[in-house]
Amino acid sequence: MEFKHISVLLEETIDSLNIKEDGVYVDCTLGGGGHSKEILKKLSHKGKLIGIDQDTSAIKAAKEKLKDYENIIYVHNNFYNIDSILEELDIDKVDGIIMDLGVSSYQLDEASRGFSYMKDAPLDMRMNREENLSAYGVINNYEEEELFKILKNYGEEKFSRKIARFIVEKRTENPIETTGELVEIIRKAIPAKFQREGHPAKRTFQAIRIEVNKELQILNKAIEDSVNRLNKDGRLSIITFHSLEDRIVKVKFKELEKPCTCPPSFPICVCGKEPQIKIITKKPIEPSKEEKEINSRSRSAKLRVCRKI
């Protein structure tokens, strides 16, 4: 299956980077190469782009799309490791970093990846297929209390307790092996009147995907490491697709902009923690009405940008 992915907030993200033609940039989520291609267009032969992705299918597709460009380095890794990645490449500082945290259209559309609740497939959901933990492992091996907490905290699912109980009851009969089986369990757990607003499995699938790929833990560390690797005036641009991610980015940016931990009663700062960034987007940038109509998957996207000081 061809790797297809429509880059969300493409123009806005590229503009936010304030690209220098001889600069060094990092695309932490290479995907199909949409954002990377626009960055490369603006770079001179002295400029450089590092494209990171944990999905080998994404890297293969990006290499084909970007075959006319020689100043890109491909890295099969997780952007959680951005610090060690740059160290291995002997790159100290960079001028801009982007993260597009959405699941690609390809990953959603290829049934075998198990990300979609619309198609029956083996329970997988691994961004990196070389990792051991899959959705199957979470659903069939986690204790009921663990499942409840994951669905509640990562999916913000109202019926997390009931869904977790139904999953555990069902798997005592036989292992739950497919997305279709899981969807049916969720449908039975959620009262019919609450199934009218969107697909009933949406929040549960989001929660399991986040757990399998450790997405929220990765994001916190990656933001800190990315800021530390930026040159003065370098930009960090992050696109999120759900409230949990957006909240993490918002809070982390605020911490880095105003890190002082002194009590409000202190007349001057004595903790010595200095601001590292300036937030560019006081409110997140959202897709235009036109983009939302063209690409329905862009509807929940939010772009937040900061500048290293």
UniProtKB/Swiss-Prot annotation:
Localization terms from the record: Cytoplasm
One cellular component (GO) term of this entry: cytoplasm
Enzyme Commission number(s) of this protein: 2.1.1.199
InterPro entries for this protein: RsmH, SAM-dep_MeTrfase_MraW_recog, SAM-dependent_MTases_sf
Main location: cytoplasm
Catalyzed reaction equations: cytidine(1402) in 16S rRNA + S-adenosyl-L-methionine = N(4)-methylcytidine(1402) in 16S rRNA + S-adenosyl-L-homocysteine + H(+)
Molecular function in Gene Ontology: rRNA (cytosine-N4-)-methyltransferase activity
Alphabetical UniProt keywords: Cytoplasm, Methyltransferase, rRNA processing, S-adenosyl-L-methionine, Transferase
Residues reported to bind S-adenosyl-L-methionine: 33-35, 53, 79, 100, 107
One Pfam family linked to the record: Methyltransf_5
One GO BP: rRNA base methylation
UniProt keyword annotation of Manganese present: no
Protein family: Belongs to the methyltransferase superfamily. RsmH family.
Role description: Specifically methylates the N4 position of cytidine in position 1402 (C1402) of 16S rRNA.
UniProt name for this protein: Ribosomal RNA small subunit methyltransferase H
Source organism of the structure: Clostridium botulinum (strain Okra / Type B1)
Gene: rsmH
